[in-house]
Amino acid sequence: MENFVLYEEIGRGSRTVVYKGRRKGTINFVAILCTEKCKRPEITNWVRLTHEIKHKNIVTFHEWYETSNHLWLVVELCTGGSLETVIAQDENLPEDVVREFGVDLVTGLHHLHRLGILFCDLSPGKILLEGPGTLKFSNFCLAKVAGESLEEFFALVAAEEGGGDSGENALKKSMKTRVRGSLIYAAPEIVKGTEFSVTSDLWSLGCLLYEMFSGKPPFFSETVSELVEKILYEDPLPPIPKDSSFPKASSDFLNLLDGLLQKDPQKRFSWEGVLQHPFWKDALRGEDSGWASEDSPFSRNVMECSGPHDSRELLQSPKNGQAKGQKAAHRLSQSFRLENPTELRPKSIMGGQLNESIFLLSSRPTPRTSAMVELNPGEGEDPSSPQKTSPLSKMTSGHLSQGALESQMRELIYTDSDLVITPIIDNPKIMKQPAIKFDPKILHLPAYSVEKLLVLKDQDWNDFLQQVCSQIDSSEKSTGALRAKLNLLCYLCVVATHKEVATRLLHSPLFQLLIQHLRIAPNWDIRSKVARVVGMLALHTTELQENVPVIEAITLLTELIRENFRSGKLKQCLLPTLGQLLYLVATQEEKNQHSRDCWAVPLAAYTVLMRCLREGEERVVNHMAAKIIENVCTTFSAQAQGFTTGEIGPVLWHLFRHSTVDALRITAISALCRITRQSPTAFQNVIEKVGLNAVISSLASAICKVQQYMLTLFTAMLSCGIHLQRLIQEKDFVSTVIRLLDSPSTPIRAKAFLVLLYILIHNRDMLLLSCQARLVMYIERDSRKTSPGKEQQSGNEYLARCLDLLIQHMVQEPPRILGDILNALANVSGRKHPSTVQGKQLKMCLPMMPVVLHLVMSQVFRPQVVTEEFLFSYGTILSHIKSIDLGETNIDGAIGIVASEEFIKVTLSAFEAVIQYPVLLADYRSTVMDYILPPLVSLVQSQNVEWRLFSLRLLSETTTLLVSQEPEDGDEEASCDSDSSLLALIRDELLPQYEHILMEPDPVPAYALKLLVAMTEHNPAFTRLVEESKLVPLIFEVILEHQESILGNTMQSVIALLNNLVAYKDSNMQLLYEQGLVGHVCNMFTETATLCLDRDNKTNTEPASTLLASLLDILLGMLTYTSRIVRQALQVQKSGSRGDTQAAEDLLLLSKPLTDLISLLIPLLPSEDPEISEVSSKCLSILVQLYGGENPESLSPENMVTFANLLMTKEDPKDQKLLLRILKRMVTSNERLLESLKNTGSLLQALERLAPAHRLRGPWAGISCALFQQRAAAQGIPELPPYGIPCCGPSHKRVTGVKLYPC
């Protein structure tokens, strides 16, 4: 079976993911749909209808597979998106484009109908665009053969999958909902419930043409009933393009749409009318003639078909399964009918093993967030358009199975950087060679350049070769001849560096001649140069034919090395050539994918190379031998297998550990890494010989490449299970790997993540150690570097893939950890003395709770970890903790008191981390209220002070978050139920404890009051509960206890609570007044206002301003309440009723101390905070209305300056009038204040400037009247009001002291 490489995700539905893929070993790209098995009927239907269709306008089916968890459908890749996307982006298309697209639609649909296939659910989302713009039909999930029942087919496939048909009728019923397509494009007869037909498909075709031109379908509505009404009874409006610059529809196009959208199928266009329509301008002439030559048998016979066929016949009998009564039955491909339902089966893995390893994840990055497409039947499946998104689709959290995870991990063990190839010959890191030069003067043949050699004609090339061979084969032994021969060999070394020249020389008679001279050359100078030429040819050639005597050369070189093994210089000359020839043969054999006898390397060659590796050899010889093994073992070939001996691993390790040259150490460990890729036992032998600790210590090497290769070796070992149990239990190993995450090298960090993933898969306990060693921090750091949208640097793609797999695995761990903890706690629930086995289970499970804490504190893991299941499990654990706190369960004896308290503390801390992000709780509001808050309320009553405080804080903050969240549309009823449950919980369980809670030291009262604040804000009726629970006296006791710290959290909370109590319209204000509300408010207001007005102390200004705003609201509420009571009393008095005004007078007397705040309210009027300024003015206005100028300090010099400045700076006439009314009330009710006003020049000047603007009306009239009277009395002038304005205006009532009487 061929494998496929998966690239980026290009689509996603509720049960399907679409990838761009490639068939391994080719450059053929495809679309690969990975679908859950519950969609087998739809996918089977798609396959049976299209597996033999080859048409330019239909997406080609390639093959399908079944693995353990999924169905995989491989189809043609369309890169242009869907027609739906095109319409959405362009809004509407010109008529010429509609015609061009329409030709493709008609051609494809016509071909399907000729084959007897009805598409049934034609919509823009199921039409894909190939790159050049060709439209193709896709997603045949709901298509069918004319006349058959799709429900029966689906039920039959599902029954066969289930192993029988005992429930076939039930299956048929359940399938009815699965075969419904999009109603928007359905024909009227389909809406009425009749079967699909050719004419119903043509109606859908008309809808598509209409939508392409106008940008919207002919019939559309938000409600199904209204849409059905339109389809059945309304005529479509003429299509109008959204872009007004586009020309209107032509008469031919309107005529075509009218013919296709006829509600009566008998009047609707047939194929003949469609194909011959003038709108197409002869573009469908070929289709038209093809249809005419067939005499339209299918169209007639389908409409004459008496009824649906039995799908069992269609599946089981190719004869009976064909449409009854159809004369053109031979046109219905027999591939649509199956003699046996098991005939049409997806391919499975060889050997019957169902796994997903045939689909390999490519090295390209997969986007973390992909656009989702709804792939359910009827929604339109779009394998190549990531833009198509269904509003109903939901993200599915598909976790990889362990087999699939490890399959992807194995693909990541070796990267390109692990398998880099560098030359063996002329490698400067091994040995620096002098540059090769030749003298053209003594060459005795044309010194052709490489460029010239490439363009030589065959005859010239042959002549050139003949001259070269003749000169090399010359038997002359003079010094000049030898020098000329050496010069020629140098020339050949130079030209052999070009690939094409090297390939031609290698396959020429010259190569055989060079081999001969290796054997018979008169001196070693010639032999070394010949060997160098052969090595250069082997290095640069691009192919190797079987007739080239390369094995002969290898054998000869092996013999020469063996015969002269004591000569280090000769080995340095011959080993590079031997290595290049071995690598050449290995690469060619790997390319051909099978072993060839003509390339069988003699065993002596391997023996010689092994001897060159051993201790005692020269460093250069060791390096060359290691380099040969490194290069050859990069390939999967028989030549590489020749090195897989028991001693190769320890020999390379010894070379690595004892060499003093870094380049040699890197080559040795690289060779070991690559030979371990061939045979993992090579590294296993090393560990067994030198010990695991010695090998682990090598990870601390200062050489990055060494660290990289060591990590690769350990990953390979872990992947095949060798020494698995030892490695996953070795804490030093884990700690060393985690320290490598600080490396600046991206590949090292990626491989460290991969090693840790292998460890964590097999030993969950190491997750705790890893988290304590800051693994989560490292993951967050590298996740930011590899996040989508950032420019990807080299190696970041590989890092992202390793990181993604690690994150996927770690996300699955919290549910397992919580499940284990729940099982352990459930086993000891209610037991005072757990058994030894139960205690051991507790010791294993409870210490893992910090892992959950680490993950929920991480922005990478938190959104994936906090689910409804997580919160439910967490709430259940809290219930067990409640049982432990009440003494019903005892775990202290099993795990110790310290461990028990630590477990509870970490558990509470985990939820504290969750509530820092309120958005996570929005979707699970009911779960939190039902399962988490009740045990928290119980823990508030705990005897353990720390748990009690912690639980109260969590309860307070959680409740504040939950009650402040608005329920989503449709969730109002559930939200109401949750609120009722919360209210009952707090009323029955918590409020009775408040008398004790509020008297505890800080910060307990602050959290308790914060909860009351949240509840009274969210549900004002909760105020009644506060009063009924007799908490009001306790609230004022809290004020007395904490009044010295006015800015503390407790005072802030109590002031906010008082604000809510006063603001509630049905609040029992009398109760508040009886508890000393007025005095407390005066004291708190005075202290807070003083802090706000203190310009020298800016530290407390901001918190004091916030607190002052709340106190102003309280004061305003109190004054408003008093004003309402007084107004009611005056109305009773005015009406002549004998109503009692004593209550109002008592309230006025009780509230009179509030007049002392006037001198503080006036300086607050110019506040920069508009809220403080506005509320202060309202409070001041009501105070002077109630008490007039009772406060002699009201118009102190400082306050009058404030009034003067405000009158001159306020531009809004309403603000000026309010200030004037306040002044008028003060000066007309208190002569002392009037005298003070007369003696203050700045305020008088301000009033005089405002006089013309107000023309002596309203409040200005009252002030001027008072001033005039006082001046007249001083000068003996009769008391006549200026300009004839009455002194006090209309008759009104005035309050002085505590009596109510007329003015």
UniProtKB/Swiss-Prot annotation:
Q: Where is the catalytic site?
A: D121
Q: Where is this region: Disordered?
A: 304-332, 369-401
- Protein kinase domain: residues covered: 4-280
Which reaction is this enzyme known to catalyze?
L-seryl-[protein] + ATP = O-phospho-L-seryl-[protein] + ADP + H(+); L-threonyl-[protein] + ATP = O-phospho-L-threonyl-[protein] + ADP + H(+)
MF terms in GO = ATP binding; protein serine kinase activity; protein serine/threonine kinase activity
Effect of gene knockout: Knockout mice are smaller than sex-matched littermates, and all exhibit domed heads typical of hydrocephalus. The majority die before reaching 4 months of age. Brain lateral and third ventricles are severaly dilated with frequent hemorrhage, sometimes accompanied by fibrosis and neovascularization of the meninges and choroid. Nasal passages and maxillary sinuses are partially filled with varying combinations of proteinaceous fluid or suppurative exudates. Suppurative otitis media is frequently observed.
Biased composition annotated in UniProt, kind: Polar residues: 384-400
Q: Which family does it belong to?
A: Belongs to the protein kinase superfamily. Ser/Thr protein kinase family. APG1/unc-51/ULK1 subfamily.
Q: What is this protein called?
A: Serine/threonine-protein kinase ULK4
Classification of source organism: Eukaryota, Metazoa, Chordata, Craniata, Vertebrata
